[in-house]
Design a protein with these regions (language model features):
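Class I S-adenosyl-L-methionine-dependent methyltransferase catalytic core
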Residues: 1-137
Length: 137
């Protein structure tokens, strides 16, 4: 199943250069594990899963929206756009929390974390464990 998704993602046309090895969609289980944290943050804002606005700037094949919708999160921005151009032109959609699993190749992780800090909004970034020992900022 994972290889099918990976093949599908790599066959999509993207408006940005995409490394084949970066085409791994975040699993439903990962979102299920994060959902209680999102619930706590939503409650702090006086919102629910239906009204919390989630932004994932890194598009792969589109499962982010369907998985989060399946968990009851109704407003999810994850479009097939070049997030670096979106950020450069200050066209980031309005959101309550940024939730993403950035590509692991190149300097995507660093760019992502710098943007998260610069936006001064809530964020959750899924990274491999080896990143815990790195100083990206």
């Amino acid at each position: 199943k994972t290889s099918e998704k990976r093949k599908h993602a790599s066959e999509l046309s993207h408006p940005f250069k995409a490394d084949y090895n970066d085409h791994f969609e975040t699993s439903l289980q990962a979102y299920t594990d994060i959902a209680p944290l999102l619930d706590l943050y939503a409650a702090k804002l006086g919102k629910t899963r239906k009204t919390l606005v989630i932004y994932d700037p890194y598009f792969c094949a589109g499962s982010t929206v369907s998985y989060l919708n399946e968990l009851g999160f109704a407003i999810v921005h994850n479009t097939n756009t070049d997030c670096y151009k979106v950020w450069q032109h200050q066209q980031t959609p309005m959101y309550d929390v940024l939730l993403t699993n950035p590509p692991f190749s190149g300097d995507h992780k660093e760019k992502c974390l710098k943007q998260c800090v610069a936006m001064k909004k809530a964020w959750v970034v899924l990274l491999p464990s080896y990143c815990a020992t790195k100083n990206y900022l």
